[in-house]
Amino acid sequence: MSKVTPQPKIGFVSLGCPKNLVDSERILTELRTEGYDVVPSYDDADMVIVNTCGFIDSAVQESLEAIGEALNENGKVIVTGCLGAKEDQIREVHPKVLEITGPHSYEQVLEHVHHYVPKPKHNPFLSLVPEQGVKLTPRHYAYLKISEGCNHRCTFCIIPSMRGDLVSRPIGEVLSEAKRLVDAGVKEILVISQDTSAYGVDVKHRTGFHNGEPVKTSMVSLCEQLSKLGIWTRLHYVYPYPHVDDVIPLMAEGKILPYLDIPLQHASPRILKLMKRPGSVDRQLARIKQWREICPELTLRSTFIVGFPSETEEDFQMLLDFLKEARLDRVGCFKYSPVEGADANALPDQVPEEVKEERWNRFMQLQQQISAERLQEKVGREILVIIDEVDEEGAIGRSMADAPEIDGAVYLNGETNVKPGDILRVKVEHADEYDLWGSRV
């Protein structure tokens, strides 16, 4: 009787943003297709892959620590991802790393794995990989990456130097992936990229094909097509181009979720110019007003940076004034920190850490108040909620206004007869600064 050769085992660590998560899913899918077993522990693995983040200093530190832990626990480590674009920095701290590749270098990663842990003799029918691929998210939602890279040159950001200029995926390929996800039971698709609203710019919005039908390569056409799948579609990382106005009617018609994640970064024209970001705050406020008139249910999420080099109290006050007027629903705020390779590092008048901290606290205090007031308006109303978790105490879900992991939650105490992915109608009974509580209707 022939001896069964055990499958080679690969440990995997995925750090950073959802875009990195999608890269990890692609590598894992290829490994599983080739017959490798992916395991959760280092000591049981023949090798470990660490997919790193290198966007800000804290992310770099986390990545370096993860590499160090993998080396200590296992010894055979391949590094990929954004920090991989800075090989010298990794080698200086961890010279024993076997191989280093940059972001979206899937083929290189697989070649390195084949070199150190040869490909098994694999019968694909013994270990079927799901058609939608290996996913690191719960079964009921998934990220759909539509492009790679970015054409902007924001002075605080090094993404273009790590991931290159914008490269849009063919729209037929994107829509086919979306269909596979829905067929596999996904109820919510989160559209991501470095710059979602620029989708198709690099190919001059050429016409592609899906199911034999012509489809324009653009964000608006993509949203129109995704709306036909009968699931929740959520847009992330939307740069405030003029054509963003065109997706708001789709939200008002219920074709995609009335949710827009649009990083604005600041509200002082002077600071925005230093950041190389769009600078007309009055125009942005007018657009927000218009969007809400067209789609009253619209949820606006944004992120901002406080303590950017040379930011004065007057600049910061402009930001607070903008918050008061815009009354955004979901807001993240970061204290500026220098990122190696970013142009902003060379700007004069760096803001002291204690000033950054004080401004961040004032910013968050104001936004918490706004968020609490916005959520209080929902008390007594009925909303749709998608369930994420269920235990003996009840269920936790999200409304259309909440993206996974970054926004709030809806708590349904005592509601145990549901499962993740169920979409319920819920009456809101209570709210705080970030979350809602309610009961099933």
From Swiss-Prot:
Domain of life: Bacteria
Span of domain Radical SAM core: 136-373
GO biological process: tRNA modification
Cofactor binding annotation: Binds 2 [4Fe-4S] clusters. One cluster is coordinated with 3 cysteines and an exchangeable S-adenosyl-L-methionine.
Record: residues binding [4Fe-4S] cluster 2: 150, 154, 157
Pfam families the record matches: Radical_SAM, TRAM_2, UPF0004
Record key words, sorted: 4Fe-4S, Cytoplasm, Iron, Iron-sulfur, Metal-binding, S-adenosyl-L-methionine, Transferase
Main location: cytoplasm
Cellular localization per UniProt: Cytoplasm
Ranges of residues in domain TRAM: 376-441
Domain MTTase N-terminal: 8-118
Residues given in the record as [4Fe-4S] cluster 1 binding sites: 17, 53, 82
Cofactor: [4Fe-4S] cluster
EC number of this enzyme: 2.8.4.4
CDD domains: Radical_SAM
GO annotation, cellular component aspect: cytosol
Transmembrane segments: none
MF (Gene Ontology): 4 iron, 4 sulfur cluster binding; aspartic acid methylthiotransferase activity; metal ion binding; protein methylthiotransferase activity
Catalytic activity: L-aspartate(89)-[ribosomal protein uS12]-hydrogen + (sulfur carrier)-SH + AH2 + 2 S-adenosyl-L-methionine = 3-methylsulfanyl-L-aspartate(89)-[ribosomal protein uS12]-hydrogen + (sulfur carrier)-H + 5'-deoxyadenosine + L-methionine + A + S-adenosyl-L-homocysteine + 2 H(+)
Keyword Transferase applies: yes
Keyword Nucleus attached: no
UniProt similarity note: Belongs to the methylthiotransferase family. RimO subfamily.
Record function comment: Catalyzes the methylthiolation of an aspartic acid residue of ribosomal protein uS12.
Protein name according to UniProt: Ribosomal protein uS12 methylthiotransferase RimO
Gene: rimO
